[in-house]
Design a protein with these regions (language model features):
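Surface-exposed beta-strand/loop patches in extracellular or lumenal glycoproteins
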Residues: 47-70, 158-180
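Short structured motifs
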Residues: 31-38, 104-110, 157-162
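Extended, low-hydrophobicity, Ser/Thr/Pro/Gly-biased non-transmembrane segments
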Residues: 122-216
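Intrinsic-disorder/low-complexity, polar/charged segments enriched in Ser/Thr/Lys/Arg/Asp/Glu/Gln
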Residues: 32-34, 45-51, 60-62, 106, ...
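A surface-exposed beta-strand-loop module
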Residues: 63, 68-141
Length: 235
């Protein structure tokens, strides 16, 4: 199963111009997540602090979002209420890397029209949806799991609902991760540009936020203005 971690790669342009098509510095009309993550693979757990810059159009409205049922909200700077009658079973995920979305809880939050700061939500818990390999072609993929944190590796995507999911709109994000001492040699991989030790960021609109982690060896090679990165899983 975790042979799927053997190779992860990214490619990025070096020193892009902010005037190039597709760049959206500080896009104000998209939800932006700023994630601080503590991972303990041995305990199959994570602790997350998410500071969200909300689109202006959301101010003064009641919002709903979903979060993995294995995670519990521990703090928020706006009142949040869980809808006890709206626990949603796992379902099909469109345009995702896996077939099924994790079971989630649904929450409600009222955002004042005068709200000018960032919505801050902290949460923690475990995610370990073990894959059942129904045929040989799944042996090296994550097609049968919505998300997993374990001593063998971490794979989280939109289907894991590990980040508050409001709707199907595009988002931007930055993240930084720290590991428990037992995984101190691990490395994270996500979209966008590396930002310090185990940090990633992108202002390009995304459909989801990946978080992949294991003990990798990192290789890079440049070809003109493009730098290719390969993350090989250590045996």
């Amino acid at each position: 199963f975790f042979l799927g971690f053997a190779l992860c790669w990214t490619a990025r342009a070096q020193s892009p111009s902010l005037n190039e098509p597709g760049t959206t510095p500080g896009t104000p009309d998209l939800l932006h997540h700023s994630l601080s993550i503590d991972l303990d693979p041995g305990r199959e757990s994570l602790v997350v602090s998410d500071r969200m810059r909300l689109p202006q159009a959301w101010l003064g409205h009641n919002l709903q979002f979903e979060l993995n049922s294995g995670l519990s909200i521990t703090a928020s700077n706006l009142p949040i209420s869980e809808d006890p009658n709206a626990q949603v079973a796992s379902g099909d995920v469109i345009d995702s890397t896996v077939a099924q979305e994790a079971e989630v809880k649904r929450y409600r939050i009222s955002v004042p029209a005068s709200f000018s700061g960032e919505l801050e939500i902290s949460y923690s818990g475990t995610i370990n949806d073990l894959a059942e390999q129904s045929s040989p072609e799944y042996a090296q993929s994550f097609a049968q799991t919505s998300g997993i944190i374990s001593g063998e590796g971490v794979f989280l995507s939109r289907a894991s609902v590990w980040v508050p999911l409001f709707d199907d709109r595009l988002i931007t994000f930055d993240l930084s991760a720290r590991f428990a001492p037992s995984a101190s040699d691990w490395t994270t991989v996500s979209q966008g540009q590396p930002a310090g030790l185990n940090g990633w960021q992108t202002e390009h609109p995304q459909e989801e936020i990946y978080l992949i982690a294991a003990e990798f060896t990192h290789y890079t090679e440049s070809a003109g203005r493009v730098e290719a990165s390969a993350y090989l899983r250590n045996p």
